[in-house]
């Protein structure tokens, strides 16, 4: 059984027991979160596609870790002008483990 959920403006295909890195959620480590925006639920040949969401479906997950990804560095310059700038960015993420899919 698997589901496609929407969180943080992205879609993720998840199954029970999967660990997924999603955009930062406002939840503490060890707590439980529920994803209500379920787009698709499949159990073998039984597939439920939402229009746009599946009614009554939800995915429960446990927050494993809060962290930041590796640094992404951007460098801009203008030739012959002695002008340059260097920026760094680390995107925060939340690692969740899917516990239960209800449809």
Swiss-Prot record:
One of its GO terms (biological process) is translation. The keyword Iron does not apply. It comes from the Bacteria. GO terms for cellular component: cytoplasm; ribonucleoprotein complex; ribosome. Pfam families: Ribosomal_L21p. One of its GO terms (molecular function) is structural constituent of ribosome. Transmembrane segments: none annotated. This protein binds to 23S rRNA in the presence of protein L20. HAMAP family: Ribosomal_bL21. Part of the 50S ribosomal subunit. Contacts protein L20. This is Large ribosomal subunit protein bL21. It comes from Lactobacillus helveticus (strain DPC 4571).
